[in-house]
Design a protein with these regions (language model features):
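Phosphate- and other anionic-substrate recognition elements at nucleic-acid/protein interfaces
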Residues: 1-155
Length: 155
């Protein structure tokens, strides 16, 4: 497998939450953080994040390491993929730092970028076709079950 450092000059680590995404640009050569910013978790916010990253990474040699591409990071991952960006699913993050109390969205974003750089293999996010539709139906069904049980308990 090709080393990620041979393919890109910058890795943008992303820690998504329900309402916002926090991104941090890390240089491949120094592994130093160039900048970090937070954007709304909306289509418009995703566009802002991409424009921000383009101003910091003038070349097109960048990768996005996004946590939770199956949930909170799905919208950003899909938007970036549509724009032709190199998106990597950052799974199984190291939890040591958060156990030590050093937990923040910007630290998590930097950690995502740096840990992705250290890996020999990486995953691309799953497509959002039938699998995503089925997941949505299951969530809706489970929610309806909970509402039904709550209504019965009220009676």
């Amino acid at each position: 497998m090709t080393d990620l450092a041979e393919l890109v000059d910058h890795v943008i680590g992303v820690d998504p939450d329900r309402d916002r995404v926090t991104a941090a640009v890390v240089s491949v050569t120094t592994q130093g953080e160039l900048a970090a910013a937070t954007f709304p978790a909306t289509r418009r916010g995703y566009g802002q994040a991409l424009r921000w990253a383009k101003t910091l990474t003038v070349d097109e040699r960048r990768a996005w390491a996004i946590e939770s591409t199956g949930s909170y990071g799905a919208g950003l991952a899909a938007t970036l993929a549509e724009k032709g960006e190199f998106v990597i699913e950052f799974d199984h993050p190291s939890t040591r730092a958060s156990k030590d109390g050093a937990k923040s969205d910007s630290l998590d974003a930097v950690r995502a970028a740096r840990e992705t750089l250290g890996r020999k293999t990486w995953a691309t996010p799953r497509s959002r076709g039938l699998r995503e539709g089925l997941r949505t139906l299951i969530v809706a069904r489970d929610s309806a079950k909970l509402a039904r049980v709550a209504a019965i308990n009220v009676l």
